């Protein structure tokens, strides 16, 4: 490929917003995943909601483990740090509709392991036991396909679409204290966002 052809191709990519040129540094690929800033997430709404169906959370497991690299980065921890992972599924009657996984630094909230959060509110416990004052959260939203474990827990086929939301919550001192990964069944949920225009 000639230099002229390569230069023209890079110009076209830059015009399409796929790469960014910085004088003295070179050309950089821009992430294909949009980084939007909605004014307000209004709600996650169940489709075809049935009145008077009792919603419950069922515990899958709760354990202390070494932080996976991505979770360590979210919580600004070293890779060898111990974390608590709480994995639960939310049901409406007998139908599962989302999987929720909470991660915390183990030394920050050690008493979490002594409680059953299928019956008790995790947020209320954190507020009462540790007086955590939440300041803000950062959230990313993806569309993914269910792997075998997710499919089994949510009673769907492997490869079914899921709405995956990762939220990192910060305390009043701007420290990331909780990472929550939630996997919503795309056939039961949609996301409503309010935007300023």
Explain the meaning of each model-derived region.
Residues 1-29:
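N-terminal helix-turn-helix
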Residues 4, 36-39, 117:
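Residues at secondary-structure transition points
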Residues 9-12, 28, 47, 100, ...:
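Residue-level recognition of specific faces of alpha-helices
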Residues 28-42:
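Short, cationic-aromatic polyanion-contact patches
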Residues 45-49, 124:
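Acidic/proline- and glycine-rich, intrinsically disordered low-complexity segments
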Residues 54-197:
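C-terminal all-alpha effector/ligand-binding and dimerization domain
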């Amino acid at each position: 490929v000639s230099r002229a052809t390569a230069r023209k191709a890079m110009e076209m990519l830059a015009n399409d917003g796929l790469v960014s040129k910085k004088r003295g540094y070179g050309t950089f690929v821009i992430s294909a995943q949009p980084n939007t800033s909605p004014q307000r997430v209004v709600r996650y709404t169940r489709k075809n909601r049935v009145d008077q169906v009792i919603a419950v959370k069922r515990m899958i497991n709760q354990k202390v483990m070494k932080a996976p690299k991505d979770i360590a980065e979210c919580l600004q921890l070293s890779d060898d740090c111990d974390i608590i992972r709480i994995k639960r599924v939310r049901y409406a009657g007998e139908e599962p509709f989302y999987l929720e996984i909470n991660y915390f630094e183990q030394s920050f909230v050690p008493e979490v392991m002594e409680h059953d959060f299928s019956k008790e509110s995790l947020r209320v416990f954190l507020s009462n036991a540790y007086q955590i004052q939440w300041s803000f959260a950062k959230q990313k939203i993806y569309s993914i396909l269910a792997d075998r474990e997710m499919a089994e827990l949510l009673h769907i086929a492997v490869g079914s679409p899921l709405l995956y939301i990762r939220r990192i919550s910060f305390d009043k001192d701007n420290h990331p204290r909780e990472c929550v990964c939630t996997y919503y069944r795309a056939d039961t949920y949609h996301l409503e966002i309010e935007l300023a225009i």
